[in-house]
Amino acid sequence: MSIDSLPPLREVIERHDLMPKKSLGQNFLFDLNLTSKIARQAGDLRDQPVIEVGPGPGGLTRALLAQGAYVTAIERDDRCLEALAEIAAHYPGRLRIIAGDALEQDFTALFPEGPKPRIVANLPYNVGTQLLLNWLLVEPWPPFYSSMTLMFQREVAERIVAKPDSDHYGRLGVLAGWRTQAKIAFDVPPQAFTPPPKVMSSVVHIVPRETPLPCRAEALGQITQAAFGQRRKMLRQSLKSIGGGALLEKTGIDGTRRAETLSVEEFVALANACLP
């Protein structure tokens, strides 16, 4: 079934009264060329499983299905479920709809066997960063997914790919750099969305590292949270609440440095120093 055989998205939204909700961080994409570009960025999707979070009325969903994917769409806005069901009827057996909150979803249970899914989503802005953190810190590793192609606000995208000694470098950049290889694929202007956000958006493509530096995710999460929670302070101060003095001494890292100057490898060393 061709994507062109489905009714236009604007018609679907009017028929189901699907005005985007600010409380859910919704910004809908209508441009079929753009949704197809996002789907292509995820690679060859023919007969491949894909997880989509926050599909809304299904603009990106249509593009993923048109590229041959088997899509599992997770949507917490009940208003959108009927519109998604109409798409599912056009693609029998290729669209599974889960009504619920992605933050509460056990993703590892969705695909107990077969190839690992790719995550492709225009993430709701109000939960996108937390979802990414959950996926970066998931255990066991390698993770349940094979890649992620995600839309974020440009500022968040820059934090994901940031390197030490840069303005955007922080906890997100350390965790992403530790376990994955991430790149900004392309930018999306505000006018591509309804309603248009006030900022530029970017699509980020993320591929897990098979063998990241050995480290406990929980410990690295704790270290980075403390270090960047007071990022303007010296490490001996920002890490004080978690025994930073001993950690710095054990690793030989200068306590007068600030968090944004440390490499991913140095953060891993601090996390490993937490071990008894």
Swiss-Prot record:
Keyword Methyltransferase tagged: yes
InterPro entries: KsgA/Erm, rRNA_Ade_diMease-like_C, rRNA_Ade_Mease_Trfase_CS, rRNA_Ade_methylase_Trfase_N, rRNA_adenine_dimethylase, SAM-dependent_MTases_sf
Subcellular location: Cytoplasm
Keyword Methyltransferase: yes
Record keywords, A-Z: Cytoplasm, Methyltransferase, RNA-binding, rRNA processing, S-adenosyl-L-methionine, Transferase
Enzyme class: transferase
EC number: 2.1.1.182
Record field: catalytic activity: adenosine(1518)/adenosine(1519) in 16S rRNA + 4 S-adenosyl-L-methionine = N(6)-dimethyladenosine(1518)/N(6)-dimethyladenosine(1519) in 16S rRNA + 4 S-adenosyl-L-homocysteine + 4 H(+)
A cellular component annotation (GO) from this entry: cytosol
Source superkingdom: Bacteria
GO molecular function: 16S rRNA (adenine(1518)-N(6)/adenine(1519)-N(6))-dimethyltransferase activity; RNA binding
Record: residues binding S-adenosyl-L-methionine: 27, 29, 54, 75, 101, 122
One Pfam assignment: RrnaAD
PANTHER family: DIMETHYLADENOSINE TRANSFERASE, DIMETHYLADENOSINE TRANSFERASE-RELATED
Primary role: Specifically dimethylates two adjacent adenosines (A1518 and A1519) in the loop of a conserved hairpin near the 3'-end of 16S rRNA in the 30S particle. May play a critical role in biogenesis of 30S subunits.
HAMAP family: 16SrRNA_methyltr_A (MF_00607)
NCBIfam families: ksgA
Family: Belongs to the class I-like SAM-binding methyltransferase superfamily. rRNA adenine N(6)-methyltransferase family. RsmA subfamily.
Name listed for the protein in its UniProt record: Ribosomal RNA small subunit methyltransferase A
Organism: Brucella suis (strain ATCC 23445 / NCTC 10510)
Lineage, highest ranks first: Bacteria, Pseudomonadati, Pseudomonadota, Alphaproteobacteria, Hyphomicrobiales
